Structure formats: C-alpha cells, structure tokens
Amino acid sequence: MPKVLALETSCDESAAAVVQHSAGGLEVLAHRIASQVEEHAQWGGVVPEIASRRHVEALPHLISAVLDEAGLAVGEMDAVAATVTPGLVGALMVGSLTGRTLAALHHKPFLGVHHLEAHLASVRLASSPPEAPYVVLLVSGGHTELILVDSDSGLQRLGRSHDDAAGEAFDKVARLLGLAYPGGPAIQAAAKAGDPKRFSLPKGRVSRPEGGFYPYDFSFSGLKTAMLRQVESLKAQSDALPLEDLAASFEQIVVDVLVERSLRCCLDRGLSTLVMVGGVAANVRLRVQMEQQGRERGVSVHLAPLAYCTDNAAMVGAAALGRLQAGWGSSSIRLGVSARWPLEAGGDLYAQDPQF
C-alpha cells in the first residue's frame, strides 16, 4: 500500500501528513496543521516574511509528530511530496526544500504538487468520493474557479473570477465591518443572527466583448463597492451599524452567486455531479444551500470533508498518490517553486527538465 509524507507551506498554514492508498481508497494515517492566523491577524492579512519564518520553525515538529502518530519513519515512505506552486515564494521554498532534502537523504522519489490540484484531490479523502466526469467549484482565499474533471481529457477551466476570489472578498468585507481576520469565519459567525434579505446587493457579472455575459464567471469587486457604499450610508445615519444584517446579506449574495452559476455550469454540460472544495467550501450556509438546491435540480453534490477544506497536507498527499497511481512518476529533485503556474500545466511538474 503506497504511502507518502506530504508537506504544505504555500501560505500561512504549516502542515504535514502521512497518507496511504489502500484497497478502500485513501487513508490519512496522520495529519497536523500549525496555523499562523493569530499572528497575521494584527496586520489584517498574511505577511509573507513572517509566514516563511514560522514555516521554518513549525515544519520539523509537524513532520516528527505525524511520523510518530503513524508509527512510521521517512524510510518507510514510498515518496515525499510538497506543494511547489502557486503561493508565496518564500513560504513554498520552505516546504519544497524540506521535502526534497528528506527525499534525497532517504533515496525516495519527490513529488512537487500544484496547490489547486491538491484542493481538487481533497474530495478523494471523503468516505464516498465521486467518479469523473464532474464539475468542481474551487472556492478559496485566492481562487474561485469552475473546473471540469474528466477521466479522459483531464482538467478544463470553465469559469473563473475576474477580480477578487470569494475568500478575498470575505476578508475585505470583514475588515470593512470591523470584524476579525480571517473574514470567512468572522462573517459566518456574525451572519447567524442577521437578516440575509435586509440589504439588496448586486450579483456581479462579467460582460463579453461581443455582448452578453460569461455565464460561469465571477466578479466580486462590484459587491465590495456596494457594501462600502451601504456602510457609508448607514454611518451617516447612525454610529451603530447593523453588523449581523450586513454580514448575513453579504454572505447570502455570495452563496447565491456560487450556487446558481455552479449548478448551471454542471447542468449545461449534461453532468449530474458537482464537487465543492477549498477554504470557502467550509462555509455552512454555502454547504447547506448547495446540497439543497442540488437535490432540487437533480445534481449530486459532493463536499470535501470539513477538515480538509482549508489548506492542509493530507490533500497534498492525496494529489501525490493520484499522480503515482496514474503513472506520472516523480518530479526532478531540481524542481523549484513558482508563485503562479497554470493548473492545466500541472503535468509539467513531473518533467525531468523542470521549467522552474
């Protein structure tokens, strides 16, 4: 049964995991995450230099912890994997160098993993993972995309955000409302007691040059502007803002847009399976309404397990095992890191003459 030691350091979460491929599917033998949220919260967002330093401090302890829990040594792994793109370059370098060093010392293959491919693989950690073809809504702090996963043709992007990702919009609106960082959980908490219908907010659409709109694309910049104007108008009338209602109205409109366009994309492609992954996929309102409306429209909705929605190393291990199982082999030990790399070109990470 193939086993990998997987590392994740693409942003502000240091993580390590041991993942095994068994007869019943993927099994997470151990996983640990060291979050830096509290440290970055005072700055209102991630500070790259701080993130890199904390990865250096945390990663060795995390690796020791998961190996101890799994009762295994690095020498018993079939491979070592680490996220190498996209992300903060300094942060990525910590995980990549650590992974490549361990692989070289123990004579194991190294697999450089695309961060978005890892998110896509997170649904394979569910008890009953879906089978391709299906549409994936990848919705996180840095990405909002609709992706077709097909066993024959691979990955094809069908829709994307043209400005902020949904998670980034949550962070910025939370800051506008004076709520904590990260914005997703803060807005969700405030929205519980709010009226989601109190404020009318726009559903951003992206115009085609030839007329009409891109049906599966997203834009959240107009929504942010509308929230800013709403807050300014309310402050002109009173010092006390109806934070719960503002949070609920914002959360609801984002959920409406994500649900409507995702299900439409799925049905337009003649598919009956939709997968949702990424940090924002942990949002309760989004999970409930996606499943509910999916049932009403004949679409089976598969959600990444909550523990593996936000950045983690188990999903990196899942992606690496998927590549091994598909016969992609390993990455070059000379593979570096890159702040950006197309998801569709993820196979380039396994070339023996690396492009970065």
From Swiss-Prot:
Superkingdom of origin organism:
Bacteria
PROSITE patterns, per the entry = GLYCOPROTEASE (PS01016)
* UniProt-listed Gene3D superfamilies: 3.30.420.40
Query: Where on this chain does substrate bind?
Result: L138, V139, S140, G141, G142, D171, G184, N283
User: Keywords for this entry?
Assistant: Acyltransferase, Cytoplasm, Iron, Metal-binding, Transferase, tRNA processing
Q: What does the Swiss-Prot or TrEMBL cofactor note state?
A: Binds 1 Fe(2+) ion per subunit.
Task: Give the EC number(s) under which this enzyme is classified.
Answer: 2.3.1.234
Q: What class of enzyme is it?
A: transferase
InterPro entries named in the record: ATPase_NBD, Gcp-like_dom, KAE1/TsaD, Peptidase_M22_CS, TsaD
One of its GO biological process terms is: tRNA threonylcarbamoyladenosine modification
Keyword Acyltransferase (UniProt): yes
**Is DNA-binding a UniProt keyword of this protein?**
no
Catalytic activity, reaction form:
L-threonylcarbamoyladenylate + adenosine(37) in tRNA = N(6)-L-threonylcarbamoyladenosine(37) in tRNA + AMP + H(+)
- Give a short account of what the protein does: Required for the formation of a threonylcarbamoyl group on adenosine at position 37 (t(6)A37) in tRNAs that read codons beginning with adenine. Is involved in the transfer of the threonylcarbamoyl moiety of threonylcarbamoyl-AMP (TC-AMP) to the N6 group of A37, together with TsaE and TsaB. TsaD likely plays a direct catalytic role in this reaction.
Family to which this protein belongs = Belongs to the KAE1 / TsaD family.
- This chain's protein is named tRNA N6-adenosine threonylcarbamoyltransferase
Q: Which organism is it from?
A: Synechococcus sp. (strain WH7803)
Q: Which gene encodes it?
A: tsaD
